[in-house]
Amino acid sequence: VRDSCEPVMQFFGFYWPEMLKCDKFPEGDVCIAMTPPNATEASKPQGTTVCPPCDNELKSEAIIEHLCASEFALRMKIKEVKKENGDKKIVPKKKKPLKLGPIKKKELKRLVLFLKNGADCPCHQLDNLSHNFLIMGRKVKSQYLLTAIHKWDKKNKE
């Protein structure tokens, strides 16, 4: 369960809870029977799934929900996106803070965001960097993790 859930949790800045770490339980003592080796594996969806922070519709309810759940929010232009250690590293060009949260003003100048475990999943918002974006996220340890990204549309008053 951990192996399938933890990567999705990390996209949003959460790690596997300490209380569920396997080494706290006696080995072989599980309440759910293990799947026999000859059982057929559940079919997995075909194709590459979109990074969860990128898989959202531009609806005001979704934006407000992300904003409330995030520690920080910025309007920004993106200079570049790189792959680094299995993550997508997002380097801002210009940024305007909307909600600073844990970001200190002096850190804002050198701010770099990470899409945790996002190196190989598509994020269509990042295909064209000429737009402004609404970026939301949270700080985990010393990294600022992107938890939602929306194209900033000046014309859409919603």
From Swiss-Prot:
Residues 51-158 form the NTR domain. One of its GO terms (biological process) is negative regulation of B cell differentiation. Transmembrane segments: none annotated. Disulfide bonds join 51-121, 68-123. One of its GO terms (molecular function) is cysteine-type endopeptidase activity. One of its GO terms (cellular component) is cell surface. Pfam families: NTR (PF01759). CDD domains: NTR_Sfrp1_like. PROSITE patterns: FZ, NTR. InterPro entries: Frizzled/SFRP, Frizzled_dom, Frizzled_dom_sf, Netrin_domain, Netrin_module_non-TIMP, TIMP-like_OB-fold. The keyword Secreted applies. PANTHER family: FRIZZLED (PTHR11309), SECRETED FRIZZLED-RELATED PROTEIN 1 (PTHR11309:SF87). The FZ domain is involved in binding with Wnt ligands. Belongs to the secreted frizzled-related protein (sFRP) family. Interacts with WNT4, WNT1, WNT2, WNT8, MYOC and FRZD6. This is Secreted frizzled-related protein 1.
